[in-house]
């Protein structure tokens, strides 16, 4: 039976490095950052939703399902990941951050191949120099261990990933795909660069 995969754009953070502005809604080349992600995911998975804790009505204008973290107080990306895994009706969920408008068009394909070949429950991207755990594919079987991990007060993604024998997948030929917009200056820098 074929593995089923849905995708979630993680837009639930506080954006402290962007003066609290909602990162996913900042414009790059006339389009909100999250819409760049949505466009690049469309041909990779059958269904996409957005994890957002603010401005949900604006995100809903895109026509996709929007949901907030079940856990309160902005507990980091793992909180959004947990909520997504608990809501999912697919075998795996692909996660991407909302501030990465150039994400790889073959992200799902490569991560899926890695989990299938290794029989792992989890894979994430690296660019040959840095690990990028926010670009990850997780089995919904991890929802209970993740809930326990968060209830224990832990928040580090890579620590959880390593505990569950995550596969780090090499995207070193696509380094630029992992550029993210952490500040308004980052967005300004890339206004005239096209993916």
UniProtKB/Swiss-Prot annotation:
Q: What is its EC number?
A: 2.7.7.77
For this chain, the family text in UniProt reads: Belongs to the MobA family.
> Which reaction(s) does its UniProt entry say it catalyses?
Mo-molybdopterin + GTP + H(+) = Mo-molybdopterin guanine dinucleotide + diphosphate
The family database entries (InterPro entries) matched by this protein are listed as: MobA-like_NTP_Trfase, Molybde_CF_guanTrfase, Nucleotide-diphossugar_trans
GO molecular function per UniProt? GTP binding; metal ion binding; molybdenum cofactor guanylyltransferase activity
What is the annotated role of this protein in its UniProt record?
Transfers a GMP moiety from GTP to Mo-molybdopterin (Mo-MPT) cofactor (Moco or molybdenum cofactor) to form Mo-molybdopterin guanine dinucleotide (Mo-MGD) cofactor.
Per UniProt, what is the name of the gene that codes for the protein in this document? Answer: mobA
Name any cofactors this protein relies on: Mg(2+)
- Where primarily located? cytoplasm
Q: Which UniProt keywords apply?
A: Cytoplasm, GTP-binding, Magnesium, Metal-binding, Molybdenum cofactor biosynthesis, Nucleotide-binding, Transferase
What GO biological process, any one, is recorded here?
bis(molybdopterin guanine dinucleotide)molybdenum biosynthetic process
Protein name (record): Molybdenum cofactor guanylyltransferase
Gene Ontology cellular component annotations, sorted alphabetically:
cytoplasm
Q: Know anything about its domains from the record? A: The N-terminal domain determines nucleotide recognition and specific binding, while the C-terminal domain determines the specific binding to the target protein.
Where on this chain does GTP bind?
Answer: 10-12, 23, 51, 69, 99
The organism's superkingdom is given as Bacteria
Q: How does it assemble?
A: Monomer.
Q: Where is Mg(2+) bound in this sequence? A: 99
Q: Where, per UniProt, does this protein localize?
A: Cytoplasm
